[in-house]
Design a protein with these regions (language model features):
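Structural/interface elements that position substrates and couple domains in central-metabolism enzymes
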Residues: 1-459
Length: 459
């Protein structure tokens, strides 16, 4: 099958690369020439500057110029195409609605080219971007408006966790396809032939609207799990001194009806999907006159989590951040990615600087490049107070307190490094519960505050 993937961000690049593994002729299209040059290089460092996913560079290196091609000239490859996957950004507007300007600009261009093509074979435009329910119908209208012959529309939402996207593309939990005609379903089945009738993969065919809705409900439910544990489980551990968070989690999730996913407590979930998607769903339902109280509570709890540990440090430990040097470990929204979109660290940095912190000494294994883009001093002069280091130990040196914001494995059990690098009085603020032996720290004179636990004062 000849496939075009329009958009080479996290979703598009991963989808294009994995499709090429299965022998499809895949053209990854983007207007950003710098991105394309990085991908063509097959160099992990250059690729990782744009999309940092384990295993992705090796797939690109193995398949480029054989099954996988990168291009900024879509007109030259439009003939003979079986499917065009739309993997385009749909960022939130201020009111929570999805900004579809990038999406429809690309669609207009594609429709113009498709209307002029000489080949008469069936082509399917496939929404892989997360788009509001009903967007597939708008896409159908565009095809009619431009008089595109023999073209169909399908919805095929992605469910890729960042940091594990390659493996989940190869072995997904489910593949959801929404379309109206058997002809369009048949084309998508040929693309995903390895998943159809697979004993461990649910292959679901439905309407476009249902497929669009599945993505929103799935992401909202995942964020609900996280917000429930942060809003209820963590509050118990912080309020009642003898509640052990890990035992609480183990006891609750021992019930087979209750998922263990999301049962960890943290300083909030981030990334490109959860916050954006729940805001879009709230907007869509509100516009339709439906109540959204529960969804707004889920979103509000998650946003609250991102900075509430700073408030707790002031309230419970009497900390004043004015003129302090704060070590910040973790900038990405979670481990195994360099993605900082909606990361808790963004709110942490802004809040610390607003409270008068004199310096933020930051370290992340892979996200420092992204951090420099987000924290550009040209946008806010206070960002000049952020300095970046090559290790946790270097970031800790000379700091007055520590904030752990990302769950990188190398941050787990930092007690010895802390003791060797900084001396008490010193406060550890643990947003990911990465230090299981925190009692040993407090016995040696360090203060400790973690999500899900009350303040542990130095002994």
């Amino acid at each position: 099958m000849k496939i075009i993937v329009a958009g080479t961000g996290f979703v598009g690049l991963t989808h294009a690369a994995v499709c090429s593994e299965y022998g499809h002729e895949v053209y990854a299209y983007d207007i950003d020439q710098r991105k394309l040059n990085a991908y063509r290089s097959a160099d992990p460092e250059q690729i990782g500057h744009y999309v940092n996913e384990p295993g992705l560079p090796s797939i690109i290196a193995e398949n480029k110029d054989r099954y996988l091609f990168f291009t900024s000239d879509i007109e030259s490859i439009i003939e003979g195409t079986d499917a065009i996957f739309l993997c385009l950004p749909t960022p939130p507007n201020h009111d929570g609605s999805s900004d579809l300007s990038y999406y429809f600009k690309a669609v207009d261009h594609l429709c113009t080219l498709l209307a002029r093509r000489q080949d008469t074979r069936r082509v399917v435009l496939v929404n892989k971007s997360t788009v509001p329910i009903g967007t597939a119908r708008q896409l159908e209208h565009k095809l009619r408006e431009y008089e595109v012959p023999n073209a169909g529309v399908a919805s095929n939402p992605e469910f890729l966790p960042e940091g594990d996207a390659v493996e989940k593309s190869r072995r997904p939990d489910r593949v959801v396809v929404g379309a109206d005609t058997e002809e369009d379903f048949r084309i998508i089945r040929r693309i995903y032939s390895q998943f159809v009738n697979h004993v461990r993969i649910r292959y679901i065919e439905t309407t476009p609207e249902t497929a669009e809705g599945i993505k929103y409900v799935a992401n909202t439910l995942l964020l609900t799990y996280i917000s429930f544990w942060n809003g209820v489980g963590a509050r118990l551990g912080e309020t009642f001194s003898n509640v052990r968070m890990e035992d609480l989690k183990r006891g609750v999730t021992a019930d087979n009806r209750i998922s263990t996913w999301g049962s960890y407590v943290s300083n909030g979930a981030g990334g490109s999907c959860f916050g954006k998607d729940i805001q879009s769903l709230i907007y869509q339902l509100k516009t339709a006159g439906q109540p959204t109280d529960m969804l707004q509570a889920v979103y509000g709890i998650n946003e609250y989590q991102k900075t509430y540990l700073i408030d707790r440090a002031t309230r419970e430990a009497g900390v004043r951040f004015n003129h302090k040097k704060v070590a910040l470990l973790g900038l990405a929204f979670k481990q195994r990615t360099n993605d900082m979109r909606d990361a808790s660290s963004l709110k942490v940095v802004e809040t610390l600087l607003a409270r008068g912190a004199n310096e933020i000494r930051a370290y992340d294994p892979v996200a420092i490049g992204e951090a420099k883009r987000f924290f550009n001093p040209e946008h806010n002069y206070l960002f000049e107070k952020i300095h970046y280091f090559d290790s946790a130990r270097e970031a800790l040196a000379g700091s007055d307190m520590l904030f752990i914001s990302t769950d990188w494995e190398e941050f787990r059990g930092l007690s010895r490094t802390i003791e060797q690098t900084v001396k008490p009085p010193y406060l550890v603020i643990d947003g990911r519960r990465m230090i299981p032996d925190f009692q040993e720290l407090t016995e040696r004179g360090y203060g400790y505050i973690a999500v899900g636990s009350g303040y542990m004062s130095p002994k």
